Amino acid sequence: EVVGRLRPTAFREFWEFTVEKVAVNAVMAGARPEYLPVILAHAASGVSARSSSTTSFACYSVINGPIRSEIGMSDGIGAMGPHNHANVSIGRAYNLLSVNLQGGSEPGDTYMGSLGNPMNYALTFPEAEERSPWQPLHVQRGFKAEDSTVSVFFGGRYHIAGFGPRETWAEQFKRAIAACQHNLPPTLIVDPITTRQFV
């Protein structure tokens, strides 16, 4: 049974694939069997983790709902780094299936990112729903709190910033946001400790 299809560029044919093909890539990524529902959701999204654009934009994904804790994902210290097996191997599986099940990701042929992007490797993390002052992303998008979801985003550039002393950070933050392209609004990934400053 076909569970998804991907292609490296808009000018190439789609490749269709089965659960077995997705599972093979999950095993190659070091994923445990209990991660497969999340990896299958990535595969079924139809969005490749490997874009073919000279801007080198990359995908990242946010996991919501009960599955986050059921499979041991981390939304705390090091959640976006190489420290949690579930976070990293799910992201790596998404990357591998995007290469192997879409017809390749060959630089100069099916991959045209000029310099590439380190975010292409494995950026998957859960939202810290319990520590956020806002509704979880999936609830904002119309899902129930008890639903488990995968949301895939594209990002061209990324900026990791600390905005200095408490007295001046708000003004510096406003300037940083104002510098973003208006037709490409930013996605803010904010530590739960910092969110208290927003509410």
Predicted regions located by residue number:
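Non-transmembrane, aqueous-exposed alpha-helical and coiled segments at domain scale
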Residues: 1-199
